[in-house]
């Protein structure tokens, strides 16, 4: 029926978002050769916000956007955009700082722990999660563990910072889930990246030495990360989450790790080990299992 098709549209958008983010790992690793972390983050976020402005203008002209008309609605839109921008900034910055003290593999795995944090946090708010979705989460976690090749688990500064990043991403998913029906998705995405870009820019000027020539030398990775990963990928997340429950959304978004390995292999010619391949298969299986339609009601909330 119609409900199913809406769900598939939502899931499809989240899947596309995960693909776009997976390829962004390649752009980020190339970008880091030229730019310091906050400079790169500021460039991609501000570009992402700017790219969405003409989209908003066209949507307004065609009358397809959920434009806030009243002052109350405008205030709500700005407030939520600001909140999401601060959360995204915290998540990305914690991940970036964590990478100074831990390996990319561990960082990837610890970041993806949001897939277990989302249903756990949901329980606190009285949200029911279907039993097989828990199975999906466990399958995906085992897969991500294999994929990231993290063996020893000492908890140092890097690991704790990256766990903070996972908590921030979990908050972002839950906030989007809460507000998705109340605001225009593209406007929200644009506002959150403007906020995240400005905060990153302040940090760049405080702790780094941003140079125009370096930014221009890095235009391809910034262009991809800004236009596709920030501008398009996160907008897909916001729109997709309107039709998908948060735990399933987080599982679909965790495919980002699988795609990053695949694109690393395709573009950067990185080797794919049998263990990583098994990890990819387990994450895919977990996501497929989460798609089993069930009789459980769509998210019951207790107020």
Task: Describe each region flagged by the PLM.
Residues 31, 40, 44, 98, ...:
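Hydrophobic/aromatic residues within transmembrane alpha-helices
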Residues 43, 107-113, 176-197, 230-266:
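Helix-helix packing/entry segments at the starts of transmembrane helices
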Residues 1-43, 86, 90, 94, ...:
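Glycine-/small-residue-enriched transmembrane alpha-helix faces in small-molecule transporters
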Residues 52, 129-149, 169, 200, ...:
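Hydrophobic transmembrane alpha-helices of multi-pass small-molecule transport proteins
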Residues 39-50, 96-127, 165, 246-265:
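Specific alpha-helical transmembrane segments that line the substrate/conduction pathway
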Residues 19-20, 24-25, 53-111, 146, ...:
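Specific transmembrane alpha-helical segments of multi-pass solute transporters/efflux pumps
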Residues 38, 48-52, 118-119, 154-208, ...:
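Transmembrane alpha-helical segments that form core, pore/gating elements
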């Amino acid at each position: 029926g119609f409900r199913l098709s809406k769900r598939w549209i939502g899931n499809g958008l989240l899947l596309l978002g995960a693909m776009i983010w997976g390829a962004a790992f390649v752009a980020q690793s190339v970008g880091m050769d030229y730019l310091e972390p906050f400079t790169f983050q500021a460039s991609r976020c501000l570009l992402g916000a700017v790219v969405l402005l003409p989209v908003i203008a066209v949507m307004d002209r065609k009358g397809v956007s959920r434009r806030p008309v009243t002052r109350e609605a405008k205030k709500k839109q700005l407030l939520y955009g600001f909140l999401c921008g601060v959360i995204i900034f915290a998540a990305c910055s914690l991940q970036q700082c964590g990478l100074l003290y831990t390996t990319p593999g561990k960082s990837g795995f610890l970041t993806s722990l949001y897939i277990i944090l989302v249903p756990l946090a949901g329980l606190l708010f009285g949200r029911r999660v279907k039993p097989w979705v828990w199975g999906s989460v466990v399958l995906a976690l085992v897969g991500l563990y294999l994929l990231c090749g993290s063996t020893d688990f000492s908890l140092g500064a890097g690991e704790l910072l990256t766990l903070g990043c996972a908590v921030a991403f979990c908050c972002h998913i839950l906030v989007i889930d809460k507000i998705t029906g109340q605001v225009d998705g593209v406007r929200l995405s644009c506002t959150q990246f403007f906020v995240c870009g400005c905060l990153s820019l302040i940090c760049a000027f405080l702790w780094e030495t941003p140079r125009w020539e370096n930014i221009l030398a890095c235009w391809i990775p910034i262009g991809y990360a800004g236009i596709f990963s920030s501008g398009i990928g996160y907008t897909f997340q916001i729109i997709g989450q309107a039709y998908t429950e948060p735990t399933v959304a987080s599982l679909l978004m965790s495919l980002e790790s699988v795609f990053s390995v695949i694109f690393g292999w395709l573009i950067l010619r990185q080797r794919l080990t049998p263990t990583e391949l098994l990890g990819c298969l387990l994450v895919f299986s977990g996501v497929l299992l989460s798609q089993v339609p069930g009789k459980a009601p769509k998210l019951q909330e207790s107020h």
